Amino acid sequence: MHTQKAITEALQKLGVQSGDLLMVHASLKSIGPVEGGAETVVAALRSAVGPTGTVMGYASWDRSPYEETLNGARLDDNARRTWPPFDPATAGTYRGFGLLNQFLVQAPGARRSAHPDASMVAVGPLAETLTEPHELGHALGEGSPNERFVRLGGKALLLGAPLNSVTALHYAEAVADIPNKRWVTYEMPMPGRDGEVAWKTASDYDSNGILDCFAIEGKQDAVETIANAYVKLGRHREGVVGFAQCYLFDAQDIVTFGVTYLEKHFGTTPIVPAHEAIERSCEPSG
């Protein structure tokens, strides 16, 4: 049974330091049995960064109608009328991004951003700075909490989570100067007048596949491709927390690498020939 003290010490050994800004992507199952459960993991993370540090997570929303309204799809009138508007104070988190986020949201002093589908949660001195503002059309790119996390010198922690979980790399996708980026439109239910739902349309980069070759089902997306290439450089930290294999990345460094990678292989005048770029960048290795 893993204790808070043991998890905190393992995080520190991995390279988490007092004062860090830490975005956590976690698989609680991978960590193994923890005395006190997920709340203990949150406490260990906060202990590792100390009172001057901030812990952040990608919460999203368990009622996000992203898929139901994607690229012109439309909910029926009854669903649109009865769908709850997004309320950062009460909304659940998307379980696909890990159960830990629900416990971060419930932590004392937690702040949550107002973008329903790309909602971020943060706990610590930088919580308000990170989460506000967060407008539709700025999900994970410029003007988002994700951008502020990168610019403020954050670290991305994969706590048993796979390499396709590095949310910071979606910022690299957004700012990289490459043609033919995929765009999506979708609708989100926002609070309206007198408690009514106000449906708002958003247009943004496609974080599920920034280019066509990264949007093929069963293939690596850009985030996983870039993260795998970055790990080979050895500029990150690896270790074990509980039973979980962990990676710790400097967000600015991996984002800079990601932007360069995308522009090198997919820019207007790519250094790598197009057919080789597809082979090297869009196909899974091995």
Swiss-Prot record:
One BP annotation, GO: response to antibiotic
GO molecular function: aminoglycoside 3-N-acetyltransferase activity
Catalytic reaction annotation: a 2-deoxystreptamine antibiotic + acetyl-CoA = an N(3)-acetyl-2-deoxystreptamine antibiotic + CoA + H(+)
Transmembrane domains' residue ranges: none
Matches recorded under InterPro entries: Amioglycoside_AcTrfase (IPR003679), Antibiotic_NAT-like (IPR028345)
Enzyme Commission numbers on file: 2.3.1.81
Cross-referenced Pfam families: Antibiotic_NAT
Domain of life: Bacteria
Keywords of the record: Acyltransferase, Antibiotic resistance, Plasmid, Transferase
Keyword Acyltransferase: yes
Keyword Membrane in record: no
The family this protein is said to belong to: Belongs to the antibiotic N-acetyltransferase family.
Database matches in PANTHER family: AMINOGLYCOSIDE N3-ACETYLTRANSFERASE, SPBETA PROPHAGE-DERIVED AMINOGLYCOSIDE N(3')-ACETYLTRANSFERASE-LIKE PROTEIN YOKD
NCBIfam families in UniProt: AAC_3, AAC_3_II
Functional summary from the UniProt entry: Resistance to antibiotics containing the 2-deoxy-streptamine ring including gentamicin, kanamycin, tobramycin, neomycin and apramycin.
Full protein name: Aminoglycoside N(3)-acetyltransferase III
Protein's organism: Salmonella sp
Gene: aacC3
